[in-house]
């Protein structure tokens, strides 16, 4: 477990939380009521504020991910999925929702709109070589191991 500092812009909204004891990501809540027309009508997404700011420890990042239930039942996803939050970002977290359905989606303040997955990462130190070592797979990609 890692400690993450959080600032609530809107103290009436719950803190991001895990839906179950086995959940990997925390639910994020909408700070506003919103109306999200289908993508084909507006040609983009709608940026929704979550009402929180976080300070991730150095060496950690967070991904903002779609909620599977919203996607499956309503056609709602995230335009720039996954959204990446770096450890040095201190602004409010926003979610750029997109509506793939054919009907307008009406979201309510306090509804769960996305998930936040916090992960540890390592910085890369490149070592340039003239040729990479061979593997059994080689350069096989795009379904080369079967569908």
Swiss-Prot record:
Substrate binds at residues 67-69, 80, 84-86. Its cofactor is Mg(2+). It catalyses: dUTP + H2O = dUMP + diphosphate + H(+). Keywords: Hydrolase, Magnesium, Metal-binding, Nucleotide metabolism. It is an enzyme of class 3 (hydrolase). This enzyme is involved in nucleotide metabolism: it produces dUMP, the immediate precursor of thymidine nucleotides and it decreases the intracellular concentration of dUTP so that uracil cannot be incorporated into DNA. Belongs to the dUTPase family. HAMAP family: dUTPase_bact. This is Deoxyuridine 5'-triphosphate nucleotidohydrolase. It comes from Dictyoglomus thermophilum (strain ATCC 35947 / DSM 3960 / H-6-12).
């Amino acid at each position: 477990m890692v400690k993450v500092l959080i600032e609530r812009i809107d103290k009436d909204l719950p803190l991001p939380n895990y839906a179950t004891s086995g959940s990997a990501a925390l639910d994020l809540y909408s700070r506003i009521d919103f109306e999200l027309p289908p993508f084909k009508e507006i040609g983009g997404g709608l940026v929704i504020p979550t009402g929180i700011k976080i300070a991730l420890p150095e060496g950690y990042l967070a991904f903002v991910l779609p909620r599977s239930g919203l996607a499956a039942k309503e056609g709602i996803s995230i335009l720039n999925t996954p959204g990446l939050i770096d450890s040095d970002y201190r602004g409010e977290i926003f979610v750029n929702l997109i509506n793939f359905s054919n009907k307008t989606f009406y979201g309510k303040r306090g509804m769960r709109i996305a998930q936040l997955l916090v992960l540890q990462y390592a910085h890369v130190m490149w070592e340039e070589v003239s040729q990479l070592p061979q593997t059994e797979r080689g350069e096989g990609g795009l379904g080369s191991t079967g569908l």
